[in-house]
Curated annotation (Swiss-Prot):
Residues 218-229 are cytoplasmic. This is Transmembrane emp24 domain-containing protein 5. SMART domains: EMP24_GP25L. Residues 1-27 form the signal peptide. It comes from the Eukaryota. The keyword Iron does not apply. The keyword Phosphoprotein does not apply. One of its GO terms (cellular component) is endoplasmic reticulum-Golgi intermediate compartment. Keywords: Endoplasmic reticulum, Golgi apparatus, Membrane, Protein transport, Signal, Transmembrane, Transmembrane helix, Transport. It is found in: Endoplasmic reticulum membrane; Golgi apparatus, cis-Golgi network membrane; Endoplasmic reticulum-Golgi intermediate compartment membrane.
Length: 229
């Protein structure tokens, strides 16, 4: 039996805004992301469930960081149970879908492996375009004709959204770089152990062969004739 896990819907609290503008703050959080790293034992399958709103963009990226041949089976299903993505023996993948209202299921399957456990990293990015537009419209309710400001609320909203988008992209890139670094480090450590092991084996073989050669040469020059009395 596989293990099932529910992922909480990420929340962002904006405490620096006035209370009258909190309803428009939703325009600042169109993108929500989270990442997770776990170990999947050999012969096991683990599934995760993510509740999604209507007409959002869900991006799932996964990587096998360590274990065996760095491969895993991946399955993504819609709330109705329809298979959207099914991949076998993949080391990484990126998939984007336009979501419906409901719980999306994605599973990592390691049942084909009888020995090697896998260390798996995955990241979820949800871009809710509907809430972004609605939040921007809410901001306009608080703009009156008597407001004479050098920078309007629309400009503030645009600047904050631009900053947030750039920060989110930077965080996403840093997360991926950490995942790549972890996988490369695991590969290098595995190669290091293999090189050391075979180096020791070769050294032992060389010592044994050298000893045999010395013994053979020594035996060739020994005088085996018996002396007569």
């Amino acid at each position: 039996m596989g293990v099932r896990m529910w992922l909480p819907f990420p929340m962002l609290l904006l405490s620096a805004l006035p209370a009258t503008l909190l309803s428009g703050a939703a325009g600042f959080t169109p993108s929500l992301d989270s990442d997770f790293t776990f170990t999947l034992p050999a012969g096991q399958k683990e599934c995760f469930y993510q509740p999604m709103p209507l007409k959002a963009s869900l991006e799932i990226e996964y990587q096998v960081l360590d274990g065996g041949e760095l491969d895993i089976d991946f399955h993504l299903a819609s709330p109705e149970g329809r298979t959207l993505v099914f991949e076998q023996r993949k080391s990484d993948g990126v998939h984007t879908v336009e979501t419906e209202d409901g719980d999306y299921m994605f599973c990592f399957d390691n049942t084909f492996s009888t020995i090697s456990e896998k260390v798996i990293f995955f990241e979820l990015i949800l871009d809710n375009m509907g809430e972004e537009v609605e939040g921007q419209e809410d901001w306009k309710k608080y703009i009156t004709n008597t407001d004479v400001l050098e920078m309007k609320l629309e400009d503030i909203l645009e600047s904050i959204n631009s900053i947030k988008s750039r920060l989110s992209k930077s965080g996403h890139i840093q997360t991926l770089l950490r995942a790549f670094e972890a996988r490369d480090r695991n590969i290098q450590e595995s190669n290091f152990d293999r090189v050391n092991f075979w180096s020791v084996v070769n050294l032992m073989v060389m010592v044994v062969v050298s000893a045999i050669q010395v013994y053979t040469l020594k035996s060739l020059f020994e005088d085996k004739r018996k002396s007569r009395t």
